[in-house]
């Protein structure tokens, strides 16, 4: 059974998507940004699939399966996100993957345009030798988490949406004696100050 990449995203409905950017951009533009960032992430994933044997699952919030398929295509697998906090939902996504017999699974969001197919490849390669791989975000969270087996303890007692998420996860992993590989620190585009990261990503650097 191949490796699995799980993408957490939501249907780009105005007022529900990228809410922390609404004061700066307005609800419609924030939802449009979310749509573009999700499509950009999927373009990286499609490049990854050319070199790795991979199943891709979209775990979505908002909208329904038909709306998601119409938006992102029917060649992907869609799963509505369950109830619970982010930790509960990620723990369940990993449990489902390992119940299906996958060897390694990675969860990403769609907020990190600097996450390339090259880094995703590096993360899957790290999981051949390592229990846990994390991609630290500059806001103290993480943009990627990968495992070789279900470890629900990694998602309990975490102060989600704070700058302590990455460090708390590392501490739990250490207590569980899990081996850890970390990727380069990247920026999630969540707040108005982060928007230049997205603009740099989609604007090819001009040759002076």
Feature roles, as predicted:
Residues 34-51:
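A short, N-terminal amphipathic alpha-helix
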Residues 68-104, 162:
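Short phosphate-binding loop-to-helix
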Residues 106-108:
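Short aromatic-hydrophobic micro-motifs that form the base-stacking/packing surface
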Residues 167-208:
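Conserved alpha/beta core of the MobA/IspD/sugar-nucleotide pyrophosphorylase nucleotidyltransferase superfamily
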């Amino acid at each position: 059974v191949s490796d699995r990449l799980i993408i957490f995203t939501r249907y780009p409905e105005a007022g529900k998507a990228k809410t922390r950017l609404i004061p700066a951009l307005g609800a419609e533009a924030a939802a449009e940004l979310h749509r573009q960032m999700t499509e950009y992430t999927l373009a990286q994933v499609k490049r990854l699939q050319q070199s790795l044997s991979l199943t891709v699952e979209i775990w979505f919030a908002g909208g329904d399966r038909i709306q998601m398929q119409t938006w992102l295509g029917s060649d992907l697998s869609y799963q509505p996100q369950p109830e619970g906090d982010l930790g509960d939902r990620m723990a369940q996504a990993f449990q489902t993957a390992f119940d299906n017999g996958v060897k390694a699974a990675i969860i990403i969001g769609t907020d990190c345009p600097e996450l390339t197919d090259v880094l995703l490849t590096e993360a899957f390669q790290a999981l051949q030798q390592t229990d846990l791989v994390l991609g630290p975000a500059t806001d103290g969270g993480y943009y990627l988490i990968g495992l070789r087996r279900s470890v629900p303890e990694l998602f309990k007692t975490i102060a989600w949406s704070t700058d302590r998420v990455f460090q708390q996860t590392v501490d739990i992993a250490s207590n569980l004696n899990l081996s850890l590989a970390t990727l380069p620190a990247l920026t999630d585009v969540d707040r108005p100050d982060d928007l230049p990261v997205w603009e740099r990503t989609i604007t090819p650097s001009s040759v002076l």
